[in-house]
């Protein structure tokens, strides 16, 4: 189904990542053996995606692939239909041979907010936890990261990632593994670790922060982005049921409380670098994600609240270091 051999070969040559081979192949074999109702249809479409047909690739200012000679209308429409097979597209946007994949999230806005604050990624190894379809990994490569490893257990996100990678000519600097953070050993291997949009899905947020720290080299940097509420260092919201129609959500600290949490598990130089209310321009339904989105999740009479009566989504970005 999926061939991870290139990644195995890559980490076999890396003395820091090599021990991962003790557990990773069996985990990925188990994942592939698990049934998924849509996987055959998606793989059939993936096989029809043309390989490496982009003359120009821009990962610095966007994720854009183009040819010097544009595709004819029939070829472009065929490619668009294949890519639509992988609906819904949640993270992006991507522009592929004049096809604009207008995703639910303007993930480029988040990237623009965090980029000025992080250590430059040039020649760094990066782990992106809960990476979705890998949009931000391509932007990391645009900043000259040496290696980007993303983890996310979703079948559809892996298919979308492999479709874009195939169009780029199978770039081997980025790899998406269908795993959760709890399946990773303590690698202590990555220069930068990103966790964006994950913390509020964890029953034990402090354990998640420790798991992230255990993936970093000494002196490595964590980039943490999550939903927050207003308040002091003691403020935390724990929704009784849903939040903005999301299930499986647990803890929404204030940014100041989150800073205390990070320090309590051993991070240093913790900084709150951005707080931003999520707008319906940043998250909304599109032709590439036709399900309900943020506009339907807010109180129709008061956009400062969710339909459950909680504060409307606000996200914070914090930067922290693992001690040397």
Curated annotation (Swiss-Prot):
InterPro entries: CmoB, Mo5U34_MeTrfas-like, SAM-dependent_MTases_sf
Name recorded for this polypeptide: tRNA U34 carboxymethyltransferase
PANTHER family linked: TRANS-ACONITATE 2-METHYLTRANSFERASE-RELATED (PTHR43861)
Cross-referenced Pfam families: Methyltransf_9
Keywords: Transferase, tRNA processing
One GO BP: tRNA wobble uridine modification
EC number of this enzyme: 2.5.1.-
EC class name: transferase
SUPFAM superfamilies, per the entry: S-adenosyl-L-methionine-dependent methyltransferases
Reported function: Catalyzes carboxymethyl transfer from carboxy-S-adenosyl-L-methionine (Cx-SAM) to 5-hydroxyuridine (ho5U) to form 5-carboxymethoxyuridine (cmo5U) at position 34 in tRNAs.
Molecular-function GO terms, alphabetical: transferase activity, transferring alkyl or aryl (other than methyl) groups
Native species: Aliivibrio fischeri (strain ATCC 700601 / ES114) (Vibrio fischeri)
Recorded catalytic activity of this chain's protein: carboxy-S-adenosyl-L-methionine + 5-hydroxyuridine(34) in tRNA = 5-carboxymethoxyuridine(34) in tRNA + S-adenosyl-L-homocysteine + H(+)
